[in-house]
């Protein structure tokens, strides 16, 4: 797309940065809790590099702990519990959360009210997708976090394999061939016959099913199983037995290898952050040989929200970070163009698409119309604070079933046992 430099806007941004630096009376250390490199990259590339005066004299510390097995939450919980007694330079200022466990932190006094405590206005977040605000709104209606992302999903597939097996790599035509699960299964059989795997492994389709559940994981204190979860189990067992998948686990080396230029996996259920942040780019990768379509059913997956921590002495900086990264249209466009992220503004994406946005990783396809269509219908009404644990434990328990190590009844017993160990207040 054509990149336009608007001199007036740039001058205003510089002036705002100078004014901010002059009036900031906060602390000298900014502590940010994260689980991976994603937010540090967005912070450094789209905030720190463009607002150097805002951080003059301030040391930024990223405290990073992996998300798996509840490690990040455990680390964050410990720090939040000690927040009141921590030294000023040791207090948490910002921390990241994701959808699977957002409610755990939103409905507490550990998170600052974005409007009342931090100072953003309703007009600032007006263009953000409603579901991204609903996820981080507490039971009293207070907004407790913001995100630069929206996360509508689809199916990202290899163009060259589509041409070879299906006769076309055109996203609209490929979509017509996989527009429901029966058609998707039929294409999986064709891919197998041609020497390819439809999916990488056991977990690839999980989010496409799980995000379409009608009932939450937990009602009261009872674990519930939605039919969509059973459909995922049935399909994945079939794909594993028939060789339609490569029997890999998500995030494994085998799964990543399937994404490389010489990989044999046809496609992955993905959202913007997945193919931008998790799929290989550069030498040896299949960059440019991918395309994006809606897939058999719409879904969303994940997303990162930033929350201000109660007790922070850097509220001015927190406000500036939140506004710049999640409310400022020019910054959001920049994130989309340079990082490939699906941004949290339908208006900004519409402008980018109109201006000829192309994604090089996707063979210069414009995926924004798909994002705009799927993003408008996302609902998170079935979310609970137990989602991360339940999602992780069901995938772990069923892996043994998919591999033939246990029968289905045993896999279910193992699932319930592991969830109740994690959340002792629950029952099957």
Short names for language-model regions:
Residues 28, 56, 81-82, 281-348, ...:
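Extracytoplasmic/periplasmic substrate-recognition and gating elements
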Residues 35-61, 394, 412:
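Short, polar/charged alpha-helical segment
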Residues 52-128, 164-165, 259, 266-267:
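Extracytoplasmic "Venus flytrap"/periplasmic binding protein-like
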Residues 84, 93-154, 182, 287-293, ...:
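Hinge/lid segment of periplasmic solute-binding proteins
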Residues 116-128, 164, 173-179, 214-232, ...:
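Short, solvent-exposed loop/beta-turn-alpha elements that line the ligand-binding surface or hinge
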Residues 183-192, 219-253, 279:
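Glycine-centered hinge/linker elements that transmit conformational signals in sensory
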Residues 336-400, 426-428:
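Long, aromatic- and glycine/proline-rich binding clefts that accommodate carbohydrate-like moieties
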């Amino acid at each position: 797309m054509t990149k336009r430099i608007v001199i007036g806007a740039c001058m205003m941004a510089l002036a705002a940065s100078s004014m901010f630096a002059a009036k900031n009376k906060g602390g000298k250390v900014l502590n940010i809790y994260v689980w991976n490199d994603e937010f540090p990259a967005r912070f450094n590339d789209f905030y720190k590099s463009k607002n150097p005066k805002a951080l003059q004299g301030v040391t930024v510390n990223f405290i990073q702990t992996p998300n798996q097995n509840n490690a990040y939450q455990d680390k964050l919980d410990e720090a939040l519990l000690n927040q009141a007694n921590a030294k000023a330079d040791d207090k948490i200022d910002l921390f990241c959360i994701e959808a699977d466990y957002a409610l755990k932190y939103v409905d507490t006094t550990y998170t600052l009210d974005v409007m009342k405590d931090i100072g953003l206005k309703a007009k600032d977040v007006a263009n953000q997708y409603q579901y991204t605000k609903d996820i981080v709104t507490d039971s009293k209606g207070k907004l407790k976090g913001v995100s630069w992302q929206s996360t509508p999903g689809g199916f990202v597939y290899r163009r060259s394999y589509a041409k070879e097996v299906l006769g076309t790599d055109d996203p609209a035509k490929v979509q017509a061939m996989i527009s429901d699960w029966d058609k998707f299964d039929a294409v999986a059989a064709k891919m197998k016959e041609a020497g390819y795997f439809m999916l990488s492994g056991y977990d690839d389709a999980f989010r496409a099913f799980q995000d379409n559940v009608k009932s939450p994981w937990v009602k009261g204190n009872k674990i519930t199983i939605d039919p969509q979860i059973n459909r995922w189990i049935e399909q994945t067992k079939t794909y594993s037995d028939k060789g339609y998948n490569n029997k890999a686990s998500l995030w494994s080396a085998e799964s990543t290898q399937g994404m490389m230029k010489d990989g044999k996996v046809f496609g992955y259920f993905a959202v913007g952050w997945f193919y931008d942040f998790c799929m290989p780019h550069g030498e040896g990768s299949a960059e440019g040989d991918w395309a994006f379509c809606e897939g058999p059913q719409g879904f969303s997956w994940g997303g990162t929200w930033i929350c201000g921590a109660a007790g922070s002495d850097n509220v001015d900086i927190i406000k500036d970070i939140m506004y710049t990264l999640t409310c400022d249209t020019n910054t959001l466009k920049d994130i989309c163009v340079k990082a490939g992220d699906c941004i949290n503004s339908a208006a900004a994406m519409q402008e980018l698409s109109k201006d000829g946005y192309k994604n090089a990783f996707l063979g210069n396809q414009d995926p924004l119309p798909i994002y705009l269509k799927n993003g408008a219908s996302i609902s998170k009404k079935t979310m609970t604070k137990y989602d991360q644990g339940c999602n992780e434990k069901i995938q772990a328990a069923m892996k043994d079933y998919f591999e033939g190590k246990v029968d289905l009844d045993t896999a279910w017993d193992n699932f319930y046992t592991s969830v109740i160990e994690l959340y002792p207040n629950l029952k099957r």
